[in-house]
Design a protein with these regions (language model features):
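Soluble periplasmic/extracytoplasmic beta-strand elements of cell-envelope proteins
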Residues: 1-2, 33-36, 133-135
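C-terminal cap of thioredoxin/glutaredoxin-like
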Residues: 5, 19, 90-158
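Structural alpha/beta surface segment adjacent to cysteine/selenocysteine redox centers
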Residues: 12-93
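Aromatic-flanked redox-active Cys/Sec active sites in thiol-based oxidoreductases
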Residues: 2-8
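The canonical Cys-X-X-Cys-His
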Residues: 8-14, 134
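Short, contiguous strand/loop micro-motifs
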Residues: 9-10, 75-76, 105-108
Length: 158
């Protein structure tokens, strides 16, 4: 389980540097299961997660998650939430999402409430204090952890 915020630079770095190696060595080989858990730290992250969930195709959703992190410096800038929403929708358009569908999703309070309630529950259950926070077999890891350290932890748990 990885709890992360889509506007968190440390989360983007984790996803780009560590996660991609884990994916090749363990996830793609079905040795390890990856679960993305949204832990939005701000409205921009919440809306980006809404756009991510707007897509029902899991294969595309996973690639869109990668792209959202990769383009974080493009869309997660400034404080104008309308501009940020337009920029995150541009990322979604590249993956075949329809603008009107994304607009519908962004106006859907049920989806936002679900994401926020999941965050509240994660805070209570897992004592999340920062992002990214990773759980491997229910053991919590947060802060700066390099790939080599993650690999050792995973190997020990296989």
């Amino acid at each position: 389980k990885v709890f992360s915020s889509l506007t968190c630079p440390h989360c983007a770095n984790f996803h780009e540097v560590i996660f991609n190696k884990l994916k090749i060595e363990y996830i793609d080989k079905n040795l390890v299961r990856f679960e993305h858990h949204s832990f939005p730290l701000d409205l921009a992250a919440l809306n980006a997660e809404v756009v991510l969930r707007c897509n029902t195709n899991n294969d595309i959703k996973f690639k869109l998650l990668e792209e959202i992190y990769k383009k974080q410096n493009f869309w997660a800038v400034g404080s104008d939430i309308n501009r940020i929403n337009d920029l995150i929708k541009k990322v979604g358009l590249d993956f075949g999402l329809k603008e009107n569908k994304m607009d519908e999703c962004l106006k859907n309070n049920e989806v936002q409430d679900e994401i926020l309630n999941q965050r509240i529950e994660a805070t209570k259950k897992y004592k999340i204090e920062s992002t990214p926070t990773v759980f491997i077999n229910e053991k919590k890891y947060s802060g700066e952890i390099n790939y080599k350290s993650f690999k050792k932890i995973i190997e020990k748990n296989l």
